[in-house]
Amino acid sequence: MSDRCELLVIGGGLIGSAIAWGAARKGARVTLLDEGDIAYRASRANFGLVWLQGKGLGHPDYMHWSIRAGQLWPELSTILLKETGIDIGWRGGGGLHFCLSESEMAARRALIARSSAEGAAIRIQLLDRDALHEIVPDIGPEVRGASLSDLDGEANPLLTLNALQLAFQQNGGRLVVQFAARNIRSEPARGFVVSDANGDEISGRRVVLAAGLGNNELARQVGLKLGLTPERGQIVVTDRIAPFLRYPSNAIRQTREGTVLLGSSHEDAGFSTGTDVETIARLCRIGTRVFPALRAARLIRAWGALRIMSPDGLPIYEEAPEMPGAYVVTCHSGVTLASLHALELGPALAEGHLGPAPRSMRSTRFAL
């Protein structure tokens, strides 16, 4: 495994696969290292939302970065379908944030006003109960209204990951599976050399660390301290029922196959990906308050997965000052930002720079 490539991407999840495909489409020789099924794969339990309303408030660079990603999602879906024949389940047209009290309505009203004041290029309207009932007639009596944005949407995260990796290989990329990167070093003649626990090595002129929570240790080896921590999210899924919800929402999403996802939680549970009855019951209570008919649905599965959280919750995009050519990319919005990672960041990294990634998203903003 000594073939040298131009760009070596560590991490075969949504972030790494999107970057690798984008770089390969640019013409770079790219190798993607995938740890395999032992990885804490966030896409396995992702809610599948492309969610922009309210994102980045108080952080203008992140807000504009996220909105740009939302604008690029139709293009990403179209290209992947053309290159792979895989329909990733993209559905745009807006998303709903349901409100179950007048105080929640007031909070959404304030969010919309703040979003407008900060210059967000997204249209968010607040629907009262009557207006909401016209487009979602099955809402329960406790629902007071909802905010509806124009950029929010949804996609199937597993199909998106599959399509990205297939398209990557069709564009000449090399996918190496069951390679759990453990060590990184720089050599004058070989560039960056990455080895696994077995001593196997792969080298590349440049390297991108997109290994999720594994980035903590890998980044340390290139001189960066990230302070990433896991945050567990649990999701519940029902059996297939007749279509009733054509918009994705903050707590409830009906897939095109008919199943309903209820979620998700935000928990400090270490590296546990388990579930608990209390959280599952809370998610079900919220779902049935919004749509009482869900009380008749049969629950078939619940699961947990880990989000990758930086100290302030925002992404990190950085080139290691001590080891130029080594880049770190990490975020907890792998679905939302996949379009931007694939269509703009990946091509930039193929050329040896971070392109449009905001400088304010370097790890130097933390006092670690």
Swiss-Prot record:
Its EC number is 1.-.-.-. It comes from the Bacteria. Keywords: Oxidoreductase, Plasmid. Heterodimer of a subunit A and a subunit B. One of its GO terms (cellular component) is cytoplasm. Pathway: Opine metabolism; octopine degradation. GO terms for molecular function: oxidoreductase activity. Pfam families: DAO (PF01266). Oxidative cleavage of octopine into L-arginine and pyruvate. This is Opine oxidase subunit B. Signal peptide: none annotated. InterPro entries: FAD-dep_OxRdtase, FAD/NAD-bd_sf. It comes from Rhizobium meliloti (strain 1021) (Ensifer meliloti).
